[in-house]
């Protein structure tokens, strides 16, 4: 009898402890959300009733602060915010979610629920669906596009609106620097603008890093981000055991940014580092890295449906700092930045965004939609490379039968216009600096 009583007392005590813990978590999270200093992003979200608002993107890219931006703008004090990466909620079970919400609603009676990184909870989608069916207004975030997509494609199909968050674009970057963007700049303002552009080219647009001045600290934090993405969003998420081998692969991929890759090329490079990974595993690992937003793979355009042997690889902001040839590759970094800006503008790799490579020419980007556009990226133009880029356009227009197409060459700071004639039709090539192109969207 005594043992049964002791067990009951322990259970009651455990329940009380859990209740106190959950209350602390809710109150702490509410305090964080209310006190957060938010610099608004240039991103809009549709607040459609009865739809679950899904916000996804790279770890540390600004998803949480975008939630705070939404709260500040639309909900003020009428919300509950729960960060499921709070260490006190690690391994929380589905039945405990109900208790957590019950306690949260006793503290703040609201219909507006903000769940940060809820994908770490098993069966989170069923919990969220039930709440949505009960009339709650729900916002969720996650760092994995595919894991979110899997649940969204089943339990939450037709019930969600998705918004992708990437690190800051250059316009937002300047806002974080308190630089006033306008149409014309004085000599001093232009010099300051180019100073910030150089910083953006070097480190990219992760929000926290943008607000730090010390370059050594910037690099340290970037390394923490790289490790966080690698260990939490790749190794842990996919239960990978051969960490040493996949880390070698990660480093190889970063060194190959803005380059064409193939499984065969990667396998040969792994051999040079005395590392063996099967081709099937390489393919799977590329998918894991892509899912975690560490890399992006862009396919060579073709009108024919065929097996893709080669892709061009790009990395998320600033990761080029960990390339061995970083200092020599400003052109590749600029190309990588152009790719990321195109992604921010809503173009999706291998759906309406490609590169074009044939035996005798190459074009960095093809936007293949209602309005077609060819884009070359060249850090600094001279007579030799200008002629090469123009000839590539002439060949691409003929080869791909692009009668009506916009043509751009994006540079560091060169600008102007060139005219070409293809099959008796005149085309205008706009040469535009990256900073101007990125600020006029």
Curated annotation (Swiss-Prot):
Q: Name one GO molecular function term.
A: ATP binding
Q: Could you tell me which Pfam families the record lists for this protein? A: AAA_14, DUF4143
Q: Which amino acid positions bind ATP, per UniProt? A: 57-64
Keywords, in A-Z order? ATP-binding, Nucleotide-binding
Q: Which SUPFAM superfamilies match?
A: P-loop containing nucleoside triphosphate hydrolases
State the signal peptide span. Answer: none
- Cross-referenced PANTHER family, in alphabetical order? AAA+ ATPASE DOMAIN-CONTAINING PROTEIN, ATPASE
Return the protein name: Uncharacterized protein MJ1544
What species is given as this protein's source? Answer: Methanocaldococcus jannaschii (strain ATCC 43067 / DSM 2661 / JAL-1 / JCM 10045 / NBRC 100440) (Methanococcus jannaschii)
């Amino acid at each position: 009898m005594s043992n049964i009583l002791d067990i009951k007392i322990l259970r009651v005590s455990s329940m009380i402890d859990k209740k106190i813990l959950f209350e602390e978590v809710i109150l702490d999270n509410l305090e964080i959300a209310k006190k957060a200093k938010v610099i608004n992003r240039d991103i809009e979200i549709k607040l459609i009733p009865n739809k679950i608002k899904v916000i996804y993107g790279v770890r540390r890219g600004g998803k949480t602060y975008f939630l705070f931006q939404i709260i500040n703008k639309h909900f003020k004090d009428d919300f509950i915010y729960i960060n499921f990466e709070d260490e006190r909620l690690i391994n929380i079970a589905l039945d405990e979610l109900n208790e957590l919400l019950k306690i949260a609603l006793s503290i703040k009676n609201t219909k507006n629920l903000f769940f940060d990184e809820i994908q770490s909870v098993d069966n989170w989608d069923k919990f969220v669906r039930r709440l949505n069916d009960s009339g709650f207004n729900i916002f969720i975030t996650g760092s994995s596009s595919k894991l979110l997509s899997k649940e969204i494609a089943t339990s939450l199909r037709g019930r969600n609106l998705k918004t992708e968050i990437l690190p800051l674009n250059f316009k937002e970057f300047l806002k974080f620097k308190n630089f006033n963007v306008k149409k014309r700049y004085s000599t001093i303002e232009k010099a300051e603008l180019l100073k910030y552009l150089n910083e953006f080219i070097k480190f990219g647009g992760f929000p926290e890093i943008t607000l730090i001045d010390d370059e050594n600290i910037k690099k340290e934090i970037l390394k923490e981000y790289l490790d966080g993405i690698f260990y939490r969003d790749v190794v842990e998420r996919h239960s990978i055991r051969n960490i040493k081998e996949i880390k070698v692969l990660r480093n190889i991929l970063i060194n190959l940014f803005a380059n064409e890759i193939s499984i065969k090329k990667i396998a040969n490079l792994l051999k040079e580092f005395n590392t063996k990974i099967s081709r099937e595993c390489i393919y799977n690992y590329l998918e894991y890295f892509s899912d975690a937003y560490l890399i992006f793979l862009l396919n060579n355009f073709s009108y024919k449906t065929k097996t893709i042997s080669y892709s061009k690889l790009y990395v998320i902001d600033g990761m080029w700092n960990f390339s061995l040839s970083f200092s020599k590759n400003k052109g590749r970094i600029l190309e990588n930045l152009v790719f990321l800006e195109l992604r921010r503008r809503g173009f999706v790799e291998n759906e309406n965004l490609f590169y074009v490579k044939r035996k005798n020419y190459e074009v960095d980007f093809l936007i293949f939609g209602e309005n077609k556009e060819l884009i070359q990226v060249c850090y600094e133009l001279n007579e030799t490379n200008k002629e090469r880029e123009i000839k590539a356009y002439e060949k691409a227009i003929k080869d791909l039968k692009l009668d009506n197409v916009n043509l751009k060459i994006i540079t560091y700071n060169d600008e102007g216009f060139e005219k070409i004639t293809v099959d008796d039709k005149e085309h205008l090539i706009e040469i535009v600096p990256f900073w101007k192109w990125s600020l006029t969207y």
